[in-house]
Design a protein with these regions (language model features):
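Alpha-helical transmembrane segments in inner-membrane proteins
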Residues: 1-326
C-alpha cells in the first residue's frame, strides 16, 4: 500500500510539474501581439523585459498567495480565510489611493515608484496595527473580526480618497485595483523571490510547532508550544507575502482561498511541511493558467480568478453541506 501511495504521489508530482512547465512556456510565447514561435523573438527586449518577468511573477505570486491563504486557514481554523482576511490588501489599496490624490495635488503627477511604496507601506501599517492589537486580544476569532473591520474601514477611506482624486487619475486607480502581472520588473521578481525564501525558511524552522498548533491550542499548550508565538509567525509570514505581492501586482483575488483546498484534494499529505510544496505548485498552476487566459480573452486577471474561484467556493460549501447531511 505504501508503494502504491508513493507511486501515485510521484505520478502526480510529475504531472503537476509538467503542467507548470507547459503553462510557463505558453505564458512566454503568448502576448498582446499573439503567438510568437520565431526564435528571434526569444532574444528580443519584449521577451526579457515584459514576458519573462510577467511569467516569473505569476509563478512567485501564485506561490505566495497560495501559501498565505493556507496559513490563514490553518491559523483561524476557517476554510474560507484568505490572504485578504486581515485587511492587508485593503491597507495597500488605501495607501495607493491616498498617494494618488496627494501626488496629484502636490506635484501634479503620480510617480510609479510612489504607488509601489504606498501599497507596501499601507500593507505594513495594517500588519503593525494587528501586531499591537494582538497583544491585547488573545482570542483569534476576535483578531479575525478586528482584521475584517479594519479592512472595511480602509475600504471606506479608500473610496473617500478616490472621490477626492483628480478625474484623470481614476483610470490608473481602477486598473491597479484589478490586479496584473504585466508591469512588473525583474528587480521586483527578485525581491518577491527573496521574501518568499525568507518566509518559507521561517515556517520550515517552526514546522513542528505549527503541526502541533494545527491540532488545537490546548494540545499545543500541553506540549509546551506557545500558540501566540505560532500565530504571530503565521500572521507575519502571510502578511509579508500579501504586502509584497499586492504592492507589485495589485490585489489578486481567490488564489489564496482556492489553492489550499485544491492542494489537499490532489495531494494526500497531512503534515504542514509536506503540504507547503503541494500548495505552492497548486498556486503556480492557478496563477499561470489565469494569467494566460486573461491575456487570451483580454480581461483583467481578477475577472478570471473570480470566475474560477467563486464557483469553487460555492461548490465547496455545497459539498460540505451535503456531506454533513449525508
Amino acid at each position: 500500500m505504501q508503494n502504491i501511495s508513493s507511486r501515485i504521489i510521484f505520478i502526480r508530482l510529475l504531472a503537476s510539474s509538467l503542467v507548470v512547465m507547459l503553462l510557463f512556456v505558453l505564458s512566454l510565447l503568448y502576448g498582446s501581439a499573439g503567438w510568437s514561435w520565431e526564435l528571434e523573438n526569444w532574444s528580443s527586449a519584449i521577451f526579457w523585459e515584459l514576458r519573462l518577468p510577467r511569467s516569473l511573477m505569476a509563478i512567485l505570486a501564485g506561490t505566495g498567495l497560495a501559501l498565505a491563504g493556507f496559513w490563514m486557514q490553518l491559523l483561524f481554523k476557517n476554510p474560507l480565510a484568505s490572504p485578504s482576511v486581515l485587511g492587508v490588501t485593503n491597507g495597500a489599496s488605501l495607501g495607493v489611493a491616498f498617494v494618488t490624490m496627494a501626488a496629484q495635488s502636490i506635484w501634479g503627477y503620480n510617480f510609479p515608484e510612489l504607488t509601489l511604496l504606498a501599497a507596501f507601506a499601507g500593507s505594513m501599517a495594517v500588519l503593525l496595527i494587528l501586531a499591537v492589537v494582538r497583544l491585547r486580544l488573545n482570542n483569534l476569532t476576535s483578531l479575525l473580526i478586528f482584521g475584517v473591520m479594519l479592512g472595511h474601514l480602509a475600504g471606506a477611506l479608500e473610496t473617500i480618497f478616490q472621490r477626492a482624486a483628480a478625474r484623470n487619475d481614476l483610470p490608473n486607480l481602477i486598473y491597479w485595483s484589478m490586479g496584473s502581472f504585466s508591469k512588473v520588473t525583474m528587480i521586483q521578481v527578485l525581491w518577491l523571490g527573496l521574501s518568499l525564501a525568507i518566509v518559507i525558511f521561517i515556517v520550515v524552522r517552526n514546522h513542528r510547532s505549527i503541526d502541533i498548533f494545527s491540532l488545537g491550542e490546548q494540545i499545543a499548550v500541553s506540549m509546551s508550544i506557545s500558540p501566540s508565538k505560532v500565530s504571530n509567525v503565521l500572521i507575519f509570514c502571510s502578511g509579508l507575502l500579501t504586502a509584497v505581492i499586492t504592492a507589485f501586482c495589485g490585489p489578486i483575488a481567490f488564489i489564496g482561498l482556492a489553492a489550499p483546498h485544491l492542494a489537499k484534494l490532489w495531494w494526500p499529505f497531512r503534515t504542514q511541511l509536506k503540504l507547503i510544496p503541494a500548495v505552492a505548485i497548486t498556486g503556480m498552476v492557478i496563477a499561470l493558467f489565469c494569467d494566460v487566459l486573461a491575456r487570451f480573452l483580454d480581461l483583467p486577471i481578477n475577472a478570471i480568478t473570480s470566475l474560477i474561484g467563486a464557483p469553487w467556493v460555492m461548490w465547496w460549501l455545497y459539498q460540505n453541506k451535503t456531506q454533513r447531511h449525508g
